[in-house]
Every structure is written in structure tokens, then in C-alpha cells.
């Protein structure tokens, strides 16, 4: 075989392998999407709200690589913070703080920062970035209990404190799935920052589609409804979706946000893009 023929055969083999790899990649992607839709349809009909929340925390703790501390603030976040936060060295509470991405950024800007986070391994990382700030292992249920109810539980040290601002950690409001829980989280945040802003980021309804109506998704939903009826569980609203790396999510509409602002008697400023974010401001 001549060198030219060998080169030509090698190139044809490379093209064939590349095409085969592309086809395999498409098959894998379609399979992943189908399985995700099947699971979403089933789980949103078979699990209670509390079970969806605990599943979300568990998945959030598994996908550690998605929440690296080294990731800096996005441009929209930095612009947002500069526009609405009181000047440093104000004291800020960061909820659901993950590994401390916001904590590190705020401290570099001169703020004093306290935080809480439900995943213990993340709390350890976050604590190293908080300086003298308080970092607790707690979730939103603990937070609301400490601030709104009996002042007890893992978040008890926060009860009675006053902050100049509260930041609900990146996208964390998206994982608060029921209207009652959403109202309580916002009420607790406002109680700790009575004169300051509360900042929240989330999936916005216009930017995040509702659950897809695929054949596989409908099959999963049908199976989930049977299990849900047996367990006495109602189906989740269409605003709730499911992602392997995020768990369950709630996509907010303008009406949702306006309703939440009204319950705490706050002024609302919000933007759906590039990532949904809102500021709940005290009355002027």
C-alpha cells in the first residue's frame, strides 16, 4: 500500500469514527432527555413538597463541581449589588450560601458577612471565607423557625439579629417550592433586615419553560399520579420542574413576585434577564 493510499484510508476511518461518535452522542443526549422527562413527570406527581425539597438538598450536595467557590460574581450580580446594597462595611446575611461564592465576593468588597447553608461539607468551605462572620448549618425551614416561630433550632443564633441587607444565595429562591414557604422565607428575611433590601435570584417564568409535554413525560406523569393517589399526594403545579443537577425548581412570574412583595409590604424591583433577580425594598 502506498503512503497516499494509507493516508486516505486513515482519513476515511477517522471520518467514520467521528460520525459514529456524533451519532452515539445524539443517542445518549436523547436518552438523557427522555429519562429526565420521565423522572420529572413521575416525581412531580408522586412526591410531596417536603420530599421534593429534601431531594433537592441531597442532589445539590452531590453535584459539588457545579458550585465552586472560585467562580466570581457575574456582571449582572456585581451591577445589582453595587446598585442596591448599602455601602460597606454594612453587615449582610447570605442565605443558602453554598461554598461561599457570594461570601467571598462581598468580603472582598469590604462587607461583614454572616451566612447559612444546608450542606455540611459546603459549610466548612464557606466558613473559611467568612472571616469573623457567623456561618451556620441550616436550611430555610430552620431559618423560618428561628426568626418567625420559637427562636430555636440550627438557625437560632440568627434570631433577633439585625442586618443591613439579606441576599438569598444564588438561585436559592427557585428551590422554595410552595407559596407558603416562599412567603415565610421572605418574611423572615425582611424581619432581619427591616430597613434594608432583600435580594433574591430565581428562574423567571418567561426564561424557563414549564414542564415539557413529551410522550415520555406524560407516561411518567401517569405513573406518578397512580402513586400519588395511593400516597395521598397532590401533583405539583406546572411551575415546578426537575433537573438532575439542581433538583426541583419553581419558575417565578411577575404575578408571583408582586404577590410576595405585597405580603411583606415591600416595594418590588425585578429583572427577568439575564437571570431572574428581584430586590424587595422597604417602604420609602
Name every feature range the model reports, one short phrase each:
Residues 7-98:
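Conserved class I S-adenosyl-L-methionine
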Residues 99-151:
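Class I SAM-dependent methyltransferase SAM/SAH-binding core
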Residues 146-166:
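A short acidic, Gly/Pro-enriched loop at the edge of an enzyme's catalytic core
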Residues 164-180:
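A short SAM/SAH-binding and catalytic strip from SAM-dependent methyltransferases
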Residues 183-195:
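A short glycine-rich, Lys/Arg-flanked "PGG" loop and its adjoining helix->strand segment in the class I
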Residues 200-260:
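SAM-dependent methyltransferase
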Residues 266-276:
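Conserved S-adenosyl-L-methionine
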